[in-house]
């Protein structure tokens, strides 16, 4: 695994190697902001939503299907020998510490419904790339004809990733058009 630290019009630099390419797609989710700044020389208002979940290791099945605690926004999903509890989101950037208060909130509500739950394991925090208009950036760099963008899908990255991949592939390989509503120009002009 290598982290891209610099993108130039025909070369990517990682911590280990330099790679030359004909085209490059910046599809690094919440980590796209700094790469766009290097490439375009401009700031984009990409923020990081941080979503939390915890897991309870359980020997017996406590739920037969996923459920939602509507009033608190917590969701419980049974998995093999464990129960995942998810909920809460915050705008917190990439470098802030995990919020123990948010973890405790999820645990408290899960235990309110299922008092027999053991102590939670594996607190987790995920980064979701979010733009002010809630639309992703999909399309060409206005500065370099061989650099393309595909990021900013909020909570729907896994859901929209395949469609975005198809759009970018068609753009690069066939010159297909992508609606200007997804253009990075909306933040650079």
At which residue positions do the language-model features occur?
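Short, well-ordered beta-to-alpha junction loops that form the rim of enzyme active sites
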Residues: 2, 88, 153
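Generic recognition of long tandem-repeat/solenoid scaffolds
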Residues: 14-16, 85, 148-150
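C-terminal lid/capping helical subdomain adjacent to the catalytic/cofactor pocket in oxidative enzymes
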Residues: 137, 141-189
